[in-house]
């Protein structure tokens, strides 16, 4: 049962946990994980009858909407930070070209500064390493952004499926109520008809007794004559 659940939620069980992430990214992803767990717990709630399932859905719907709003804000925050980091990298790569060109011109005009030039190469290499690290972090953020998009789409699909299921529950309840109304109306008509027949029989009983006595008196009178 657990393995089937993990397979159906591959988009969530395979994500996020890495020591290479920044503290802010780890905090954001941990918050998203907590929201995802809570949403899945709400979506997986089962009930024994159509009525209970419909009632549960309408009770949990505001909470689900709140979770989706939080999910959207977290996703938007990641996207904004990713775009900001990408823009910063672009600006840094352009500004780094100026000192590099100046260094090349100095080396061409003054051969005496070869040793000094070799000493200056170390910070440039450090800058290149830092740029590579930024590129790696940018790539990781891009992968996380794509994963978040997949997670959001999968969650939206799951919510739509649940909505359709709840609508089907409501349709079934409506049909059941209509059937009960028809049966109740039919039962009332039968009871009214049966009550009318009983009343008619009770009304005729005194008349039968009266006519019986009258017939008896008339018979006695004929005997006397």
Curated annotation (Swiss-Prot):
User: Where is the protein localized?
Assistant: Cytoplasm; Endoplasmic reticulum membrane; Cell membrane
The source's superkingdom equals Eukaryota
Which stretches make up the NAB domain?
8-89
Which Pfam family is one of those matched by this entry?
KIP1
List the InterPro entries hit by this protein, alphabetically: NAB (IPR011684), NET_actin-binding_domain (IPR051861)
The Gene Ontology CC terms held by the record are: endoplasmic reticulum membrane; plasma membrane
For this protein, the record's PANTHER family field holds: PROTEIN NETWORKED 3A-RELATED, PROTEIN NETWORKED 4A
Q: Which family does it belong to?
A: Belongs to the NET family.
- UniProt name for this protein: Protein NETWORKED 3C
Originating species: Arabidopsis thaliana (Mouse-ear cress)
| Gene that specifies this protein | NET3C
């Amino acid at each position: 049962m657990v393995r089937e659940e993990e397979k159906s939620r591959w988009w969530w069980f395979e994500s996020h946990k890495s020591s290479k992430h920044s503290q802010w990214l780890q905090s954001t992803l941990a918050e998203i994980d907590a929201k995802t767990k809570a949403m899945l717990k709400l979506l997986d709630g089962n009930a024994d009858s159509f009525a209970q399932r419909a009632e549960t859905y309408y009770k949990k719907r505001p909470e689900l909407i709140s979770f989706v709003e939080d999910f959207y804000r977290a996703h938007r925050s990641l996207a904004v930070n990713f775009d900001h980091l990408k823009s910063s990298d672009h600006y840094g790569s352009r500004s780094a070209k100026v000192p590099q060109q100046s260094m090349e011109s100095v080396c061409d005009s003054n051969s005496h500064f070869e040793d000094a030039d070799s000493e200056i190469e170390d910070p440039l290499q450090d800058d290149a390493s830092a740029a590579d690290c930024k590129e790696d972090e940018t790539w990781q953020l891009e992968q996380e952004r794509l994963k978040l998009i997949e997670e959001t789409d999968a969650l939206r699909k799951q919510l739509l499926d649940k909505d359709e299921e709840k609508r089907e529950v409501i349709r079934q309840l409506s049909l059941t109520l209509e059937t009960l109304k028809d049966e109740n109306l039919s039962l009332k008509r039968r009871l009214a008809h049966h009550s009318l027949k009983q009343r008619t029989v009770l009304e005729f009983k005194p008349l039968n007794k009266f006519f019986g006595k009258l017939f008896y008196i008339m018979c006695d009178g004929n005997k006397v004559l």
